[in-house]
Amino acid sequence: MTSACTIVTVERQPTAVVRVEAVFAELPQVQRAARARLAAVLPALDAGPAGAACTRWTPPVDGKLPMEIGTIVARPFAAREGIVSSTLPAGRAVRFSMKGGFENLPLAWQTVFDWCKAENHAPAGINWEIYGATEDAELFALLAYD
């Protein structure tokens, strides 16, 4: 399921997203609904070619996970039908490659945060996943300045 965590420098990447907040029990349904909405609207946006699917999230607030569910795109665009332009951030981040199904995400994120603690790195609270063609995913946690 896992590989080692590494620190990487990432570039800002434009995204097309649906902004949502969801309780953990509803994450699969919320993800599917947001991705269906995005698929319906994305071809009409002036965002250029679509890249990999992604989800950006910040720590839960009152039991709800704030998320930007979307895809990497070539350029920013005007909002349309609830799809807004956003970015994956630039900076130093912890990178972790998860192998296997999405049910492994909680354990994978725990691995990232445990590694940060053991290595004395402070996450900034901005995290994201970039999904591959299979169920594998690349996980990133932006680092606060050490």
What are these regions (language model features)?
Residues 1-146:
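A solvent-exposed interaction/effector surface
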